[in-house]
Amino acid sequence: MPAEELGGRVLRMREALAHRGPDGAGLWTDADASVALGHRRLSILDLTSDGAQPMTSPSGRYVVVFNGEIYNYRDLRAELARIAPDVAVRGGSDTAVLLAAVDVWGLERALERFIGMFAFALWDREERTLRLVRDRLGIKPLYLARLQGGGVAFASELSAIAAHPGFSRTADRNALASYLRYNCVPAPSTGFTDAIKVRPGTFLTLRTPDLSVARETVFWDPVAVVDGAHARPFRGDEDEAARELERLLRDSVRLRLISDVPVGAFLSGGIDSSTVVALMTDESTDVRTFTIASDSRSYDEGAQAAAVASLLGTQHETLRVSQADALGAVQRIPSMLDEPFGDSSIIPTYLVSSMARRHVTVALSGDGGDELLGGYNRHVWGPTMWRASQRVPRFARVRVARGLLRLPAATIDRVGEQLGRFSVRLPGQQVHKLGRLLKAQSEDDLYIALRSHWRAPLEVVLGAAREVPAWPGARAPALRSHAERMMFADMVSYLPDDILTKVDRASMAVSLEARVPLIDHRVVAFAWSLPERMKVRHLTGKRILRKLLGRRLPAELFDRPKSGFGIPMAAWLRGPLREYLLDQLAPARVRAGGLVEPQAVADCVERHLSGRADEHDALWDMVALHSWAERFGVS
């Protein structure tokens, strides 16, 4: 392909990512190899032109386009200067250090040394190979697609790949079935038949002439990490464990404060974000924090966050979000999503990101603590409920389950609100979930039931033959308990495919870089070395993190039901979003889309609007699916 045509196509792809990098743009082509690399820059480190990309290594062998941060780049630079003084590192960016590290150590040995979040493409001019690399936990996204007529395209978002005329928009219906179950598409699937996600902790190697065959190399294996941690368990007591966790987190936060632009933090008032902010205030007296407050009492964490901020001495900003503000954001969310994604908490995450971006360019987030340290209700209550249910004959469990599922969810919600005795949001949904759990036939079945939005997605997605697995690993770690098996599944699937995807898309939509210190890979390894009792005990999760935070804040501030940025989607779909819902999921519109069974959708709408069941998760999944399909012209 002529260099001009090749470059023109990559330019169109590059501009689809302008929101991810508004500060600069670059293009590099190798016409002989038919390879072009494009980049949009969000300037964080070395704001000069020395940090511009694509960037070439000191040897001239490698060219890179890089998204993310190598937080320990200063230490690596010093080490390189000591062992390879002849290797010149241009400028002060972590990208330049990355390239020098690959020059000196090779890719795999360099990756072992990196502490960070990253997705990058590395072109080897000598071997004529392209390597696509994604960080250990999947914090940064990276996609690859086969193109009609030959060749491949890659990008941080599928929207950029879709700008290439050779991209096929055919739906992967098996992946869509899994999406309806989990509200996100499990890696490596994407929702498109010809596109994949690069899996966390791996890199793909593609060779010329057509780069069509990709070989996957695992450089960070979560199974090996967990098994290795269990082989060398932490031997100290809970106080010693809390001190070691604090040491690791303190260094993780310190590294993530390195920036040439202003840095702040999201603060919901919960354990995770409060821990991050507390450690930030030890490193700086000038910490800015951001939260949103809601008109809905059940979802308003504004006062809680403000109390934490006051005690920690941060410069705190609260955005009080009206119903109109949030509903307006609903209309903008589909343009941020390049694959089906149904986690409605992306709406408040986008709103708090928008507010933060007016003051800072980088924000630290508390995401990841739940998956590592047993913070979800399923980790705390799931094993207990399973053991208790096994003492009851199956026929009796099924009978009780049917009775619970007949209770109208909306009625339970209203009664709970009037009595004020429920410490959980949406008690009707929780009662119905309990009814479904009583039908579970195994511990694994219970976990799937806890995560499922649509319980029988193969009956809903037209043409789907089987669901793709939530985690396609060839083997599982030798885990000691039901709770730990759920935590592992959450770490390798729910965390990258849902939580981190949400944070990346919501923050990058407004050109804000979000950093997640709780899932530094050193913290991950330590967390898995801890005995379960330090994570979950006496129906309380994240015990070790509570102990750590208790040294800084009064227990009453965080010893309460789980908080976070949320919205009353169930009520909105019956109220101000009712017409939007009916329009998006009108039977004729669903039928014309050709992806799902119209009657199944209509029945779900009826159950929710009548108040017989709380189906807001399932319905929002379906709205997001149709918005995605219409935006990309999916068939």
Predicted region positions:
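Glycine-rich loop motifs involved in handling phospho/adenylate chemistry
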Residues: 263-272, 296-297, 344-347, 372, ...
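Cysteine-centered catalytic environments shared across enzyme families
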Residues: 1-337, 349, 353, 550-551, ...
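Active-site adenylate/phosphate-handling loop in enzymes that bind or generate adenylated species
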Residues: 351-411, 494, 499, 503-523
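Short low-complexity, flexible loop/linker segments enriched in glycine and/or proline
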Residues: 331-335, 357, 379-381, 572-574
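Adenosyl-5′-phosphate
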Residues: 11-15, 31, 87, 162-163, ...
